């Protein structure tokens, strides 16, 4: 499904670009871009390749293990674990969309990406990233229902409702990414083709456009800002009710267990929103720190999410022990 959407998007955008070329005739269209990537001394190419390769393999295997565990362990066939399965798939796919091209650059020096490849990369990243943003909000709502309305949870969050909400996050991500990608690549690219970034992203592409990008920058800020702020406020509201409900639990053990179920989700939300805010919710810049932050939220964050959810989630740790054939360690 994702591949079909990407191919349709690419066809529409390239058709639009070709029509503009025929109309303007005096502009030279860019056929490819060069991903500058991380600035580093040549002798660090091999060590960086090995470091990012290890991170990439750990990310794919860690998130893949979470998905496998949720699918095979019937005790995890619950809404929160289903949402976690979606999150792991998103993290794994984001890593697969960005990291292989970086690895090729470190090892082979191959940093060229076709115009169509750049379109697909930008679309994929914003599609997956926006879907993840909606999913975090949905997971907070699920925790709100489970802790604040436990007696009604099973009747509200049915299997059908759970699947419908999860599908809604994917549709929302598709709409957002189609809008952003088409808005960026309707601009003419007729000269510079060096993308001073680790992948084709909106701020970096706007700097290469042969036209005024003020409207694009404003629309990007408004669109991403509205979505991020709305989702973040909904998450904060949900956790405000959750904390109030937890504090009313009489036993210390009960409060501790309730907090532990929410700690992992809150941690990954913070890890997601801080770099997102830094990159998109400020004026377009070309600071070296941008590349470092981009590496963090495209390479490091997907790995951190899998680690956080396996270390902070008691149910997931127990399920992994069962999957590995180890006896569960019962607390004394």
UniProtKB/Swiss-Prot annotation:
**Location(s), subcellular:** Cell membrane
Q: Which PROSITE patterns match?
A: G_PROTEIN_RECEP_F1_2
Q: How does it sit in the membrane?
A: Multi-pass membrane protein
Q: Which UniProt keywords apply?
A: Cell membrane, Disulfide bond, G-protein coupled receptor, Glycoprotein, Membrane, Olfaction, Receptor, Sensory transduction, Transducer, Transmembrane, Transmembrane helix
Which sequence ranges are listed under topological domain Cytoplasmic? Answer: 68-75, 142-160, 239-258, 312-332
Entry's transmembrane regions: 47-67, 76-96, 121-141, 161-181, 219-238, 259-279, 291-311
Disulfide cysteine pairs (residue numbers): 118-210
* Glycosylation positions in this chain: 26
Cite the SUPFAM superfamilies for this sequence.
Family A G protein-coupled receptor-like
Quote one Gene Ontology molecular function term.
Answer: olfactory receptor activity
Per the record, the similarity remark reads: Belongs to the G-protein coupled receptor 1 family.
- Please explain the role this protein plays, according to its UniProt record: Odorant receptor.
Per its record, how is this protein called by name?
A: Olfactory receptor 10G6
Organism this protein belongs to: Homo sapiens (Human)
């Amino acid at each position: 499904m994702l591949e079909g959407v990407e191919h349709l998007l690419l066809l529409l955008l390239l058709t639009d670009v070709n029509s503009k070329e025929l109309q303007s005739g005096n502009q030279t269209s860019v056929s490819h871009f060069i991903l500058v990537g991380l600035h580093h001394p040549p002798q660090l190419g091999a060590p960086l390749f090995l470091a990012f390769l290890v991170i990439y393999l750990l990310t794919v295997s860690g998130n893949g293990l979470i998905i496998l565990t949720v699918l095979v362990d019937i005790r995890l066939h619950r809404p929160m674990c289903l949402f976690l399965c979606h999150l792991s798939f998103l993290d794994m796919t984001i890593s697969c969309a960005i990291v292989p091209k970086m690895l090729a650059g470190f090892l082979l020096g191959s940093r060229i990406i076709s115009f169509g490849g750049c379109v697909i990369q930008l679309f994929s990243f914003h599609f997956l990233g926006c879907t993840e943003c909606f999913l975090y909000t949905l997971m907070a709502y699920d925790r709100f229902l489970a802790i604040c309305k436990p007696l009604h949870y099973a009747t509200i969050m049915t299997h059908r409702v759970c699947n419908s909400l999860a599908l809604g996050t994917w549709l929302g991500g598709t709409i957002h990414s189609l809008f952003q990608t088409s808005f960026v690549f309707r601009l003419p690219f007729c000269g510079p083709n060096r993308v001073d970034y680790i992948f084709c992203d909106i701020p970096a592409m706007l700097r290469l456009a042969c036209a005024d990008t003020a409207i694009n920058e404003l629309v990007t800020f408004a669109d991403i800002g509205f979505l991020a702020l709305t989702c973040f406020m909904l998450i904060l509201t949900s956790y405000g009710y959750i904390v109030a409900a937890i504090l009313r639990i009489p036993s210390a053990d009960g409060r501790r267990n309730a907090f532990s179920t929410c700690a992992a989700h809150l941690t990954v939300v913070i890890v997601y929103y801080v770099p997102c805010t830094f990159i998109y919710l400020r004026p377009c810049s070309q600071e070296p720190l941008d590349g470092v932050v981009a590496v963090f939220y495209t390479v490091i964050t997907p790995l951190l999410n899998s680690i956080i959810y396996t270390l902070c989630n008691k149910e997931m740790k127990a399920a992994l022990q069962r999957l590995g054939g180890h006896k569960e360690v019962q607390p004394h």
